[in-house]
């Protein structure tokens, strides 16, 4: 029963990891697209700069920065998953050694 629980845990960890990688990839693409749009818009407005436009762009870039903060959290989650898998590998190696 414990082995089956461990197997389900590994499966869930794998699913969680894949989903996290997908979310990171999706978020990176989204942020890249938004940053590209902002830079293109900024270039278009170089000749027509106004304080209002600058403030709007600053707020949008702050949004991009918030998105990057989210990405940092995702990478921290990935690091935690790595630590969990390392710990599991050590326990598995220990269990295998005990069985020999």
From Swiss-Prot:
Annotated localization: Cytoplasm
Signal peptide (residue range): none
UniProtKB keywords: Coiled coil, Cytoplasm, Transport
Top-rank lineage group of the source organism: Eukaryota
Gene Ontology, cellular component aspect: BLOC-1 complex; endosome
Keyword Amino-acid biosynthesis: no
GO biological process assignments: endosome organization; regulation of protein localization
Keyword Repressor (UniProt): no
Regions annotated as coiled coil: 25-46
CDD domains assigned: BLOC1_CNL1
Functional description taken from the UniProt entry: Component of the biogenesis of lysosome-related organelles complex-1 (BLOC-1), a complex that is involved in endosomal cargo sorting.
Subunit details: Component of the biogenesis of lysosome-related organelles complex-1 (BLOC-1).
Family: Belongs to the BLOC1S4 family.
PANTHER family linked to this entry: BIOGENESIS OF LYSOSOME-RELATED ORGANELLES COMPLEX 1 SUBUNIT CNL1
Protein's name according to its UniProt entry: Biogenesis of lysosome-related organelles complex 1 subunit CNL1
Organism phylogeny: Eukaryota, Fungi, Dikarya, Ascomycota, Saccharomycotina
């Amino acid at each position: 029963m414990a082995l089956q629980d461990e197997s389900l845990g590994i499966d869930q960890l794998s699913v969680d990891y894949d989903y996290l990688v997908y979310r990171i990839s999706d978020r990176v693409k989204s942020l890249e697209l938004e940053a590209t749009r902002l830079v293109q818009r900024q270039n278009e407005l170089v000749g027509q700069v106004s304080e209002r436009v600058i403030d709007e762009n600053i707020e949008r870039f702050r949004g991009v920065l918030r998105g990057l903060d989210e990405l940092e959290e995702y990478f921290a989650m990935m690091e935690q998953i790595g630590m969990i898998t390392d710990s599991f590998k050590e326990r598995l190696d220990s269990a295998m050694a005990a069985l020999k």
